């Protein structure tokens, strides 16, 4: 009789341990070990930490030539050092396609081109409707360039992501797969709600 009681108690203890041990192990791994430390997360781009406040730069709309603000929307930014060559046109096209691929969320994303010269952009108005740009004619141009120059990881060939509050937060290398950028923006928009 005593062995039956002992056996049933051991079974009960075994069942309890099956549920308690995984909880204790996960608690230990999360709070007291280096488990997953240094994990880059699920983002495809490089997270800029700490974020860089860009303020509220006034930018021009490519088609209407009106001054607008980029705040309130996620913004994909890239630099054009000289004239807009084939690489520049490919980047304009790629960013337009990224925005369109977001479907119903495309209105939450803007595209910003930062040009180092005073180029006439009128030839691109039909192909890249809604594109924004900032160049030396803009009053906020020098301040924006200074903030980027202060960033140690500046890569003029990369694409950058600015959050709706005006903080530079992510960087995508020139040869990055646009699908990764789309996934990141979808996740950010979803988590913003």
Give names to the regions the model predicted.
Residues 155-193:
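Thiol-/selenol-based redox modules, centered on thioredoxin-like
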Residues 92-113:
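Conserved helix-turn-beta segment immediately C-terminal to the redox Cys motif
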Residues 21-24, 32-68, 90:
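N-terminal "domain-start" segment that seeds a small globular fold
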Residues 68-96:
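Short active-site neighborhood of thiol/selenol oxidoreductases, capturing the structured segment around
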Residues 10-30:
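Hydrophobic membrane-insertion alpha-helices, especially the h-region
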Residues 1-9:
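Short, Lys/Arg-rich N-terminal segment immediately upstream of the first membrane anchor
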